Regions:
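Conserved active-site motif detector
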Residues: 1-153
Length: 153
């Protein structure tokens, strides 16, 4: 079984989270024409974000933070030893239930940051028509880097 819990407070830890993203995504290095040519193989879908970095699978550690000014019951989340945020208060009970599972495996996945996406110049064109690179633009943007805790048993 698997349970996922998003890390909260990630906006305050963007620099730390970015430092965990180290593996470049091959598809991010490709040009519009190259992305378009591999789309036919089903590797890349138009309108799907192609992040610069692969998802980083990190070790997870959770630690009580009794001196937290906002919540003395706060639980810090660490990815590969780096403090990246907190367990949402609403998930404390879920986390307690998960912690009781035998053979519990846990990790934290870090994702997001710079991306590019192939977008139609005129959205809503007939999808049955042939794909044509000139009908698309390659737009770059950036999402906040986020983290999600993954528990499996």
């Amino acid at each position: 079984m698997q349970q996922k819990i998003s890390v909260t407070g990630y906006n305050h830890y963007q620099e730390r989270l970015r430092s965990l993203l180290t593996e470049e995504n091959f598809y991010y290095t490709l040009s519009k024409a190259e992305l378009f040519s591999i789309d036919y193989a089903g590797d890349v879908d138009p309108d799907e974000k192609i992040y610069r970095y692969e998802i980083a699978e990190c070790s997870l550690r959770i630690q009580h933070d009794p001196v937290n000014a906002y919540d003395p019951a706060a639980l810090k989340v660490f990815a590969d030893g780096v403090h990246i945020g907190y367990v949402p208060r609403a998930e404390f009970y879920t986390l307690k239930r998960i912690a009781a599972q035998p053979d519990l495996r846990m990790r934290v996945d870090v994702y997001g940051g710079p991306y590019k996406v192939l977008e139609e110049k005129e959205p809503g064109a007939d999808w049955m028509c042939e794909f044509d690179p000139k009908d698309y633009v390659l737009r770059k943007d950036e999402d906040p880097v986020r983290a999600i805790m993954i528990f499996e048993w």
